[in-house]
Amino acid sequence: MKLFLCSHFSSVGSLIKEEIENKKVAFIPTASLREGYTGYVGSARKLFKKLGAIVTEIDISTEAYSTIQSLFEDADVIYFTGGNSFFLMDQLRKTGTDELLKKELEKGKLMIGESAGAIICAPTIQYIEQMDEKPEDYSQEDDAGLDLIDFYVLPHYLTAPFKKVTEKIMTEFSDLNLCPINNRQGIVIDGEGSKVICKD
């Protein structure tokens, strides 16, 4: 399994450009759909284009399962934008895309998760509720994440406008194995373990 988890993809994506150049990317903006600010989605698109990736966008909350399946099977890289972690996780579980994703990752494909896309990889996403409001129509009975990693990514650490809330989460969830990253850091996870890399 290969993962690249970050706070702000367009700031750090070039660190893994060899994994992206001329590759087929399934681009999933679903987490951002209900957000007021979505500038990060456009900047991610631009970086993928600059790196020569062949990008296909798909919204898992509205697209047919068979379409998602064929796109995931065809893709080299599966990318999740930032946005609301609870909305994204709800849609992944509701549609069965969570299991589809795990199947493709088992084949060695790369998943890139930005902010919400990184948070959902943890065993649970309950720790992020102070940063991400749970939607009123959230349909899951628990806050389970994808459980792809054994730690909890805390994106935008000490970065405006999340400085106070990230400090608060670090204090309140000190018993969790939190991994705080700022907007110029990313976490590479592969068969050998995980490491934080940084854009100068």
Task: Name each model feature, range by range.
Residues 33, 83-86, 117, 158:
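Short glycine-rich anion-binding loops that position phosphate/pyrophosphate groups of nucleotides
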Residues 1-77, 81:
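N-terminal beta1-alpha1 cap of cysteine-dependent amidohydrolase-like domains
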Residues 13, 35, 88-89, 121-122, ...:
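Glycine/Thr-rich phosphate-binding loops of Rossmann-like dinucleotide-binding domains
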Residues 97-159:
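Class I SAM-dependent methyltransferase SAM-binding "motif I" and its flanking Rossmann-like core
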Residues 85-94:
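Glycine/threonine-rich flexible loop motifs
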Residues 144-149, 153-191, 197:
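Conserved anion/nucleotide-ligand pocket segment
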Residues 86, 118-121, 186-188:
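Short, active-site-adjacent cap segments at secondary-structure transitions
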